[in-house]
Regions:
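Glycine-rich phosphate-binding loops that contact phosphosugars or nucleotide phosphates
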Residues: 27-29, 35-182, 215, 258, ...
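Peripheral docking tails and interdomain loops at the edges
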Residues: 312-364
């Protein structure tokens, strides 16, 4: 049974502000990686699951720095490979460095002779002559949280250094100053965990299906939130990129479901407003992370069926850094859902024989 005071997931979530502070005291690894990657013409970022979500955020961060960057799933990178050019670079993201296709992706990159960087946790099994950037200590919980934020922090540091090396001083400064703001904003958000607990308790009490939706750099925040809810609480949850949600999935949303949009200042706001107004016609319960995208949608938030978890950050924070903030209430939600349902947020369900045996049928 998960207890929000003792679960590994809960402790990792609350350790994230200090972890980011500590990572920002160390720029050696990101600087070394940037010096190598600055010599490339294109960069692939590979990962699986939560690490793929980090890789996707990394793509947006590197693009902000002026890099031709592409996030790919490690499975696809290894088994359905795109041709690599000699001036390509590859970044492989992995929590523990032990996953089958993450290692195959790394091996392919090294064997191809391209510049390769690994981003992984301390004590990782990731090996090789390539540059390895460490993030945080290995997590107790199999529902990863702090290693995700750690990987995104490292990717943002690499992006900042790449921007500086290419003469994009404005972008480099925006990333560095933005990163410095994050720990304090994170702490303020985590101090409001009771707001999240209320949402979780209501969702469990009414058996709500959960639909998470994000766009741009937060296009993976929705799927990441859904993944955490499934891993921790074994609930029915789906995560969508905003436009994908509009093109079909929304017709399955019911009035008693919970829609969880992630909306920050950026190019997707007007389209998010369209989604929210459509959702208001259906009558689904809504818990928005961020800010209402328009005056018309702001009027919907009555504190009853429509709730808002606001994030107070400076107007000059790049949108590309917001996934480090928007994921926090979704991580808390996963742990509180587990508590309300009486599940083990940390075990990956290996404490149940059927699921433990299922896990023996394949190597991850």
């Amino acid at each position: 049974m998960s207890d929000t005071k003792t679960s590994g997931l809960y402790r990792s979530i609350h350790a994230q502000p200090q972890a980011v502070r500590e990572l920002l005291r160390d720029w050696d690894g990101p600087s070394q990686a940037a010096e190598q990657l600055a010599q490339t013409g294109r960069i692939f970022l590979a990962g699986i699951g939560t690490s793929f979500h980090a890789a996707t955020v990394g793509e947006y961060l590197l693009r902000f720095a002026g890099v031709d960057a592409w996030a790919v799933r490690s499975f696809e990178f290894a088994l359905y490979p795109r041709p690599l050019r000699e001036d390509d670079g590859v970044i492989v993201v992995s929590h523990r460095g032990s996953k089958l296709h993450g290692n195959l992706a790394l091996q392919r990159a090294i064997a191809s002779g391209v510049r390769t960087v690994g981003i992984t946790g301390r004590g990782s099994k990731m090996q090789g002559e390539h540059i390895i950037i460490q993030t945080v200590d290995q997590e107790v919980s199999s529902t990863h949280s702090i290693s995700y934020v750690g990987a995104m922090t490292r990717l943002a540091q690499v992006a900042a250094r790449l921007a500086a090396l290419s003469g994009r001083t404005k972008e480099a400064k925006a990333l560095e100053q933005g990163l410095a703001q994050l720990p304090a904003v994170m702490e303020a958000m985590l101090a409001r965990e009771d707001e999240v607990r209320q949402v979780a308790n209501d969702a469990v009490a009414h058996g709500r299906r959960l639909y998470y939706i994000g766009a741009g750099p937060n296009s993976v925040t929705g799927p990441e939130g859904a993944l955490k809810a499934k891993e921790a609480a074994y609930v029915t949850a789906e995560g969508f990129e905003l436009e994908q949600a509009i093109h079909g999935p929304q017709v399955a949303f019911e009035a008693e479901d919970l829609v969880i949009p992630v909306c920050v200042r950026g190019a997707a706001q007007s389209r998010m407003a369209d989604l929210l107004l459509a959702s208001s016609e259906i009558g689904s319960h809504t818990w928005l992370i961020g800010e209402a995208p328009s005056e018309e949608t702001a009027a919907l938030f009555d504190g009853n069926r429509w709730k808002l978890f606001s994030i107070n950050y400076s107007t000059d924070l790049p949108e590309e850094l917001t996934p480090l903030l928007t994921v926090l209430p979704l991580q808390l939600l996963a742990d509180f859902l587990a508590t309300a349902r009486g599940t083990n947020a940390d075990s990956f369900r290996t404490d149940q024989a059927a699921y433990k045996n299922a896990g023996l049928r394949f190597r991850i």
